[in-house]
């Protein structure tokens, strides 16, 4: 709600006499240390392909399934609500398809203050969306030039490319490239759009190798290996999702095996031995845990959960 904005509060001459004074509080838990990798940023901008009027709203096609947000030129009167609803597909009648989002709202709402300078734009700061299509409502006379699509991903070099004479293969590679960059969000997540967006280990057990052909993912996977290690239980069990926002400690082999496989990839592709050295105690502890609880006298592991799903 732009009507509640504080104005130029970042400037030295801002009158903050009505602010509450700062208070001393307890330090947060956790370990204070330098960030291991760059953060997310806007790495590319796209122009919308089309905007079609549909009743009292508009449907915008960005031309590409991506992760990021839409920046728009602010229009309207004070109190007007501009609403952007994001989706990856359209229904047969041209409406946006949102069933795959489950209970994720995937919506940005901006309330016009009436004080915005001419030509001012707005985009969200604390959320990203996975989308190609956008349903726009509350926006007067929407035109493509009023909107800019901003692609958001972890800041890292794009180091590889591929092209051949087969158009289908080229498109498969292009789809993979966009899928990977859309899921690099401080860690490799499983999707950028629905109500999940979780760093599942198994999805990247082998995926990390192919990803490194196109992205310099050295720092990110080194950081994620630490996340996995720090999510390990005292008994050696490694979760299926790390950081363990979802409490999935199912004691299988294929998903936790991602930790040694990441370390192997970082050594093989980048010549970096440190992840192996740093994570070896955790890997050894996990192997000992599996051997103690789930290995028969014939060296057969009797426990698993997901099988070859997503691997």
Can you describe what each PLM-predicted range is?
Residues 280-283, 287:
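C-terminal PAP-associated
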Residues 207, 242-245, 250-258, 295, ...:
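Carbohydrate-active catalytic/glycan-binding domains of CAZyme proteins
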Residues 163, 212, 244-251, 267-277:
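The substrate-binding groove and active-site-proximal loops of carbohydrate-active enzymes
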Residues 1-194, 202-203, 219-222, 239-244, ...:
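Extracellular/oxidizing-compartment recognition motifs
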Residues 178-182, 213-234, 289-296:
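Glycine-rich, acidic and aromatic/proline-enriched surface loops and short helix-turn segments
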Residues 195-205, 216, 250-261, 278:
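Aromatic- and histidine-enriched alpha-helix N-cap/loop-to-helix transition segments
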Residues 206-217, 259-275:
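Well-ordered alpha-helical scaffold segments within catalytic/enzyme domains
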Residues 261, 291, 300-302:
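Structural recognition of the beta-strand scaffold that forms the well-ordered cores
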